[in-house]
A protein has these predicted regions:
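A short amphipathic helical element positioned immediately N-terminal to and/or at the very start
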Residues: 5-14
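Short, strongly hydrophobic transmembrane alpha-helices
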Residues: 16-49
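Membrane-proximal extracellular/periplasmic loop immediately following the first transmembrane helix
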Residues: 37-105
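Short acidic/polar micro-motifs at solvent-exposed secondary-structure junctions
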Residues: 62-75, 97-125, 135-149, 172-180, ...
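Mid-to-C-terminal secondary-structure elements
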Residues: 123-135, 149-206
């Protein structure tokens, strides 16, 4: 019975070749487009899903101009004292971290010099709030002291090769010369994370 249905369907397709080809191609294109869109949506919705819930980002509304009717823009910025102040005044806030970023950050280790696309200066609480994987070192206290650094696997490979970088120093030559002690190694940041960095430096260094 089913075999006959297939025969009839095949005959109809063969009899109306052009019409059938248009339908089949249209169906194939539609299904392919649907799959691509669903994959894109799933990827976008996966961003930062590996982090613990109840994380909130403070934004700042800036007014462009002096008039109260001047246009406003919302930016992901806040004053550095805001975190400690809010924590002190609102017991509901369990923790906070500040992020100050820099890009094309030059780092030197002996005779090796590299430019890191993105680095963060963060509070020691950064890895208590965000669930980035620490492979080696103390993720909870590794950024507590000034001039401490935690670097990704990729950065460690570029600077130290196969050697253990824990306890070794790296130096930034910029407006000021700053030396950091490596206290930990982190897994490379997943692509589906909004926070992309190659190294974390102690906020207390600033």
């Amino acid at each position: 019975m089913i075999k006959n249905y297939f025969k009839i369907a095949w005959r109809n397709i063969w009899k109306n070749k052009v019409f059938s080809a248009i339908n089949i191609i249209g169906l194939a294109v539609g299904m392919a487009a649907f799959m691509v869109i669903m994959m894109f949506v799933a990827y976008e919705k996966s961003f930062d899903n590996f982090h613990t819930k109840n994380i909130y980002r403070l934004n700042e509304v800036q007014t462009i101009g002096q008039d109260e009717n001047s246009p406003k823009q919302k930016v992901a910025l806040s004053m550095f004292p805001m975190g400690p102040t809010l924590r002190a005044e609102f017991p509901e806030i369990k923790n906070f971290t500040r992020i100050n970023w820099d890009n094309k950050y030059q780092i030197t280790q002996k005779d090796k010099k590299i430019f890191l696309p993105q680095v963060f200066f963060v509070d020691s609480t950064f890895l208590k709030i965000f669930d980035f994987k620490v492979i080696k070192g103390d993720g909870l206290n590794g950024l507590l002291k000034p001039h401490s650094a935690m670097i990704t696997e990729e950065t460690a490979k570029k600077l130290f090769g196969d050697a253990d970088p824990i306890g070794k120093t790296i130096t930034h030559y910029g407006r000021d010369t700053t030396t950091f002690a490596v206290t930990g190694i982190m897994a490379n940041v997943p692509k589906n994370s909004q926070l992309q960095f190659d190294a974390l430096f102690s906020f207390n260094t600033i």
